[in-house]
Amino acid sequence: MKVALFTETYLPYINGVVTHVKILKEGLEKLGHDVLIVTADTNAKRHYVRDGILHCPATSFKRFYDYGLATPVSSTRLKLVKRFNPDIIHIHNEFGVGFSGAMIAKILKVPLVYTLHTMYDDYLYYVAPRPFIPIVKKTSRKYARFLANKANALTGPSKKVEEYFHSCGVYKDVNVIPNPVELDIFLPHNIDEEKKNAFRGKYGISENTMLVCFCGRLGREKSVDVLFKYWAKRVKPADDMKLLIIGGGPSEEELKKLAVELGIQDMVIFTGKVDHKELPPYYASCDLYITASLSDTNSISMLEAMATGLPVLHRYDPLNEGQVKNGINGYIYHDDAEMYNYLVMMKNQTPEEKERFRQSVRDSVNQAGCENLANYLITVYTKAYEKALEKKEKETV
């Protein structure tokens, strides 16, 4: 099967969508399928294809992590995609490249699959001042409905996506397909032991200190401020716990100031932006992963930490239930008291209990590799392709 994957962001950018698309491409190719990535590129002066990637000229969007935005209409893009002759077009974003994917699918009469990765209601402050957010929210939902109605199949990494589509007035079936993780990179036995040991030394963290990490873009939607407030309310220096914040973003300086205001600056370490390939020893040096975010659908950073064996402490989110199971791969907390109780409980586990828990966590994600993701989606693609073929045959009768 020939599959064109349309995504506004791709390598060298790193985010959940990029990782998902990269792993999907690898999985599809391992199974013998042909893949074309269509993406925005702020360095491209013209459309060109290289190494299976169609680069589309784009403008940098400063307010949204400097990602590129391509124009939605391009006859050159249409010509190059037509030359690839896809059986399926699969869009992963809703902006210029995603919209053009939907339009090209219609022009070429190719089935369209649409994956919603992002809860845009949580990101509107990037594009609109507060007084305009209700209007932008309404417009954003209308646009999501428009794209969903164009698609032959919808997918998303959690039930949260289904609920979002319902709120937009879309009641089609949503194929819930959990996000993937690059298992080979994050499995503990593949992580450089020297780098792992050097990490704690670099930050002056003793072996006895419980190191709790969060990894992600530091934007308001990640609720790191909530995590800091919970931490400040309960955790004391005598508890011998430190919070490692891995990543950078627009809220980084604001969060550093908040840590000082809350008096927890000596318990919080900011690493700044870290290259994705350098992440494994960071996770491997930690004892557990924590998040207060309610905007994620199925956090890839969390899954990567789990592949390393880190139990997850996740703030309660009814639409993401089942991703973290108490005592299996982590614990769900509802408030600061519950968060603290779990921290203390896990700090007091014996080495044997910790290792058993880590193995249980790793087991919970061992089916999240590239080929499993590709197989899930090939099933979706095949159904969409067969239905489209059936419809075409009826129209010609």
Region roles according to the model:
Residues 1-45, 49-55, 382, 389, ...:
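N-terminal subdomain of nucleotide-sugar transferases
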Residues 41, 160, 180:
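Carbohydrate-associated surface elements
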Residues 148, 273-274, 281-286:
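Short alpha-helical donor nucleotide-sugar binding micro-motif in glycosyltransferases
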Residues 206-231:
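Conserved donor-binding/catalytic core segment of Leloir-type glycosyltransferases
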Residues 253-274:
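Nucleotide-activated donor-binding/catalytic signature segment of Leloir-type glycosyltransferases, i.e.
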Residues 294:
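Aromatic "clamp/platform" in nucleotide-sugar-dependent glycosyltransferases that forms part
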Residues 311-314:
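Short hydrophobic beta-strand element within catalytic cores of glycosyltransferases
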Residues 326-327, 331-337, 345-351:
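Conserved acidic donor-binding segment of nucleotide-sugar-dependent glycosyltransferases
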